[in-house]
Amino acid sequence: MVTIRADEISNIIRERIEQYNREVKVVNTGTVLQVGDGIARIHGLDEVMAGELVEFEEGTIGIALNLESNNVGVVLMGDGLLIQEGSSVKATGRIAQIPVSEAYLGRVINALAKPIDGRGEISASEFRLIESAAPGIISRRSVYEPLQTGLIAIDSMIPIGRGQRELIIGDRQTGKTAVATDTILNQQGQNVICVYVAIGQKASSVAQVVTTLQERGAMEYTIVVAETADSPATLQYLAPYTGAALAEYFMYRERHTLIIYDDPSKQAQAYRQMSLLLRRPPGREAYPGDVFYLHSRLLERAAKLSSSLGEGSMTALPIVETQSGDVSAYIPTNVISITDGQIFLSADLFNSGIRPAINVGISVSRVGSAAQIKAMKQVAGKLKLELAQFAELEAFAQFASDLDKATQNQLARGQRLRELLKQSQSAPLTVEEQIMTIYTGTNGYLDSLEVGQVRKFLVELRTYLKTNKPQFQEIISSTKTFTEEAEALLKEAIQEQTDRFILQEQA
């Protein structure tokens, strides 16, 4: 029989008492009164803050948006199908934040920064708030470096600078996303990180964009944030802020970033849905009163940082869809007033075969030539003027039967200039190729060709220049100026190529 020794028992009890560590936690809790349509009403949660994350019993996370006298309105980050009336909810004391790191490059994630491409978890040790304050006035500097899109019409006449916000606006199916994806493709080798945010898009459209980027090797420097049309409204509302937080992470590390929001009007619709379900008073077009602030606080985060902060930049290209060309609707006018210019895509131009269908007459960049290299300024000034005169003459020529020779020549030149602005999708041009193309058109070297031959001639000229006169590209890229030497090389190449082209056509 084992003898029980009293001193051993007392030692064990003493050890247990010493090891006992009772943590006292104060948890702010509440009870679910009602749940449905992605909204929950909670009784209790007296200490909760606006925008604070709350956790439901079964694990769903929500954001406290409405703080009323007798209940709290919470929007759910998920379907919330397992939440029951009477179940408990606790405040977390945190506001929405996401992990950030270099490991996100090349991945497709959702609004909570969770990977959705089936390639495993993403390791990150740092966190950023989804909604952080935009840089102040002292933290910024004016935009002065170009962000090349690879599209002649934009880079020559509506230039975009690093740190600018430029709206891409137009009807559905006019090539808005194509302009944005071409811009991403053109950043290859430019040391620019790209973030593409798809809000409420069809999953097939997002898959198509991702496939294009993968095929062209652009996913290496791109992050795709996707919340498709079947996602809860809360996640569609958060997705752009998640994208902005990821872009900011790189911007504050002295890198250049480009973020594309496709499109903020879908975000506004998701926010309208949430607001109406929370019983907030509706305003114009049933949007809540703070829908302007929804977009302004997002787009103000795009900036060119001052030299003391490392001169990083975040360029934003929001895409807004209009209904039959109506730019005076609520969301388009809001975003136009927040951004530094807009690129207007016209359905009529698109249907008449002018692609990209950019209406140069009403598109504008409020940064202007500050966002162009000197060489581009030297050749592009003439282009916009000639195209504007051509548009005016073309309208007049419809009514006039007999036109003098000078007017006929001007119309012929205008048709060829319009032709050189056409580009195939996913075929952005380098700035050197653009300068060569514009110079050829504005100096009358295309006037002797038929309109239908212009594109073929330009493609062959680019190839000829690259193989036989590589010094031209070197001069432009090193000096950023269209020097006399570069002009002489270009004239020589154009002359040689014109002779070859005429012989080919005759043969």
Swiss-Prot record:
Its main location: plastid. Keywords: ATP synthesis, ATP-binding, CF(1), Chloroplast, Hydrogen ion transport, Ion transport, Membrane, Nucleotide-binding, Plastid, Thylakoid, Translocase, Transport. This is ATP synthase subunit alpha, chloroplastic. Produces ATP from ADP in the presence of a proton gradient across the membrane. The alpha chain is a regulatory subunit. It is a peripheral membrane protein. It is an enzyme of class 7 (translocase). ATP binds at G170, D171, R172, Q173, T174, G175, K176, T177. InterPro entries: ATP_synth_asu-like_sf, ATP_synth_asu_C, ATP_synth_asu_C_sf, ATP_synth_F1_a_nt-bd_dom, ATP_synth_F1_asu, ATPase_a/bsu_AS, ATPase_F1/V1/A1_a/bsu_N, ATPase_F1/V1/A1_a/bsu_N_sf. It comes from Nicotiana tomentosiformis. The gene is atpA. PROSITE patterns: ATPASE_ALPHA_BETA (PS00152). It catalyses: ATP + H2O + 4 H(+)(in) = ADP + phosphate + 5 H(+)(out). NCBIfam families: atpA (TIGR00962), PRK13343.1 (NF009884). The record marks S363 as: Required for activity. PANTHER family: ATP SYNTHASE SUBUNIT ALPHA, MITOCHONDRIAL. Belongs to the ATPase alpha/beta chains family. HAMAP family: ATP_synth_alpha_bact (MF_01346). Its EC number is 7.1.2.2. CDD domains: ATP-synt_F1_alpha_C, ATP-synt_F1_alpha_N, F1-ATPase_alpha_CD. GO terms for molecular function: ADP binding; ATP binding; proton-transporting ATP synthase activity, rotational mechanism. F-type ATPases have 2 components, CF(1) - the catalytic core - and CF(0) - the membrane proton channel. CF(1) has five subunits: alpha(3), beta(3), gamma(1), delta(1), epsilon(1). CF(0) has four main subunits: a, b, b' and c. The keyword Lyase does not apply. The keyword Translocase applies. GO terms for cellular component: chloroplast thylakoid membrane; proton-transporting ATP synthase complex. It is found in: Plastid, Chloroplast thylakoid membrane.
